[in-house]
């Protein structure tokens, strides 16, 4: 009997933390913020990614938070210039001491505080540099809510790479690819873009990817946002040489080592040159990434062989995906539903005429197998056919 008692007691102790865990409540509205540049402090809490607070430099680059209850976590959304942060509280003598440090790798960073305090400040690590913060969310004690993004590093071994020219192209033209494979099927999905566009659009894309079940931070290229109708015209643009685009995509293949790549239309969907370029480079980079001799300015020198490449609207070896199936991982919502909701996260793009559509001329459920080292598809309804 004693043995049974202690076994039950041990089990209760094991599960007690999980049972007692609670979701932290946001307390931002009840906090007082202070900093140099206080006239624009409200921009950090206005819910708008297109506005931001910029600090002074050096010792004045900080935000001080005065809360009415213990602060259990901070969610910082940088506008640009990601900074490693120190979170500080005061000791008994009133001196600032560092209690947590962020990694400084992602635009959105959540910093949990083990020892809650009502007076907290954040500053660049070692007190150097400036801060550019779009939004700051302050939480009481408890676990961060699910909507708070806690990113992991980009994958070094992906199952699938969703490769897009611009933020939102991965939803408009790749449809339910990301929510279906990342969220429902539990595949390791890496997302990459050629064009970073405006800083606020990068925050929008992160919201959309998180909603779709992506946990690994996207890879974002450096190509300027240009518009041309032809592939030749695109490659003639400054910063868009054919060689540099090929190199970036080949480097991406080697970095995340995907088995499957899904990308855009060789005709650029509605004719966009950057869309044409990403489809062109996706094909050319397969051989480059696998070539041991191709080392031109490459950080990742180990060759990688992509097994399958799917292009949007590609007419050869066509594949028709069903994005309308209910997904258990999302409570019965479909991949189409999730892609549509994720596109709504791109608030700055809602004034355009673009919509997530699995019908019409840009049907995002239609793809073609442009390359395969594992044979042609037979079922034609799964990007991982012949890879299981």
Spell out what each predicted region is:
Residues 1-4:
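Positively charged n-region of N-terminal signal peptides that target proteins for export
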Residues 7-16:
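Bacterial N-terminal signal peptides
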Residues 249-269:
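Proline-aspartate-enriched helix->loop->beta-strand connector
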Residues 97-113:
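Extracellular carbohydrate recognition and processing domains
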Residues 19-70, 79-85, 89-91, 147-150:
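Disordered, acidic Ser/Thr/Pro-rich linker "stalks" and the adjacent N-terminal cap
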Residues 270-286:
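Short Gly/Thr/Asp-enriched flexible loops that form oxyanion-binding sites at enzyme active sites
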């Amino acid at each position: 009997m004693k043995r049974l008692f202690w076994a039950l007691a041990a089990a209760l102790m094991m599960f007690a933390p999980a049972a007692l865990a609670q979701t932290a409540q946001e307390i931002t509205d009840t906090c007082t913020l202070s900093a140099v540049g206080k006239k624009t402090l409200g921009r950090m809490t206005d819910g708008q990614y297109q506005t931001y607070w910029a600090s002074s430099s050096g010792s004045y680059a900080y935000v001080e938070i005065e809360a009415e209850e213990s602060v259990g976590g901070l969610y910082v959304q940088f506008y640009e210039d990601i900074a490693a942060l120190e979170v500080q509280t005061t000791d008994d003598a009133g001196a600032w001491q560092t209690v947590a440090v962020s990694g400084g790798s992602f635009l959105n960073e959540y910093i949990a505080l083990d020892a809650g305090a009502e007076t907290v400040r954040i500053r660049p690590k070692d007190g150097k540099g400036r801060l550019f913060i779009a939004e700051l969310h302050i939480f009481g004690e408890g676990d961060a809510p699910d909507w708070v993004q806690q990113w992991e590093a980009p994958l070094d071994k992906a199952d699938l790479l969703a490769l897009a020219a611009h933020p939102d192209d991965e939803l408009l033209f790749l449809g339910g690819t990301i929510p279906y494979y990342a969220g429902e099927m539990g595949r390791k999905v890496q997302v990459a873009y050629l064009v970073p566009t405006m800083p606020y659009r990068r925050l929008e894309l992160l919201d959309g990817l998180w909603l779709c079940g992506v946990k690994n931070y996207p890879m974002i290229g450096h190509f300027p946002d240009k518009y041309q109708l032809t592939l030749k015209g695109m490659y003639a643009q400054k910063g868009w040489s054919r060689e540099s685009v090929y190199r970036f995509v080949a480097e991406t293949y080697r970095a995340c080592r995907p088995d499957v790549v899904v990308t855009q239309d060789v005709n650029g969907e509605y004719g966009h040159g950057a869309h044409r370029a990403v489809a062109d480079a996706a094909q050319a980079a397969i051989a480059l990434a696998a070539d041991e001799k191709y080392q031109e300015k490459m950080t990742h020198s180990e060759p990688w062989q992509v097994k399958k490449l799917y292009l949007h609207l590609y007419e050869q070896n066509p594949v028709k995906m069903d994005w309308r199936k209910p997904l258990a991982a999302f409570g019965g919502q479909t991949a189409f539903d999730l892609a549509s909701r994720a596109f709504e996260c791109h608030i700055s793009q809602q004034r355009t005429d673009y919509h997530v559509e699995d019908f019409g001329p840009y049907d995002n459920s239609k793809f073609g197998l442009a390359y395969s080292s594992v044979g042609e598809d037979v079922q034609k309804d799964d990007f991982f056919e012949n890879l299981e």
